[in-house]
Amino acid sequence: NRYEYYDVRFDEENDEKFTLIQRLRPAVQANEFEVYYQPLINLASNKVQAVEALLRWPQKDGSMIFPDKFIPLAESSGLIIPLGAWVLNQACEFCAKQHENGHTNLTVAVNLSFAQFKDGTLPAVVEQALQNSQLAPQFLELELTETILADENGTTGEQLEAIKSLGVHFAIDDFGTGYSNLNYLQTFSARKLKIDRIFINTLGIGENDGPLVAAIISIADSLGMKAVAEGIESKPV
């Protein structure tokens, strides 16, 4: 014999997920999403060197659904494949247009999901996006989580090598929150190392965060990588 507690919030969460996934497929088919571009600024020159593509799902009432709500559903349903391809095409086209407007050194960064590697078509998708936009591959940067780099059972490594052979660059995203395996930095030639905002937001508060950030930057420098600090939103930081 046993008893369980019932919480109406469980039903509310499940209802919300069910409603979203029912709306997600037609939204993907109709390209109802928008891509915003967050600038990455060189602190030495105070100039924009790159932009990061951020996906949003606008609603008819003017509100916005953020990725943490719909990306997990897209991953579990397989819709991340067409959605991810659409984002890549949008980002490459945006960057190519910026080059035409005189911003010839601008790079665009796009986040990748581990689920995008599952069907083995990602290298072809990346190549097609570059061809469609006529963007030179060195101006596309794909951001990889440590979960992607840790995959040893699938074809992820082969696909990454195929993409790298196109001339596309990589960045390691959210460094310090996953496996943080230094071996990845030695064996995988990424151009950038992105320090997770959890370390940046507490600079000046937590006594260990400053030395940790400095150590990560030093590692990146020694390996010829650029360090990117996420979440800098004030002058003291």
Which residues does each PLM region occupy?
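Bacterial c-di-GMP phosphodiesterase EAL domain
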Residues: 8-135, 147-148, 161-162, 175-177, ...
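The catalytic core of metal-dependent phosphodiesterases that act on cyclic dinucleotides
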Residues: 124-203, 217-237
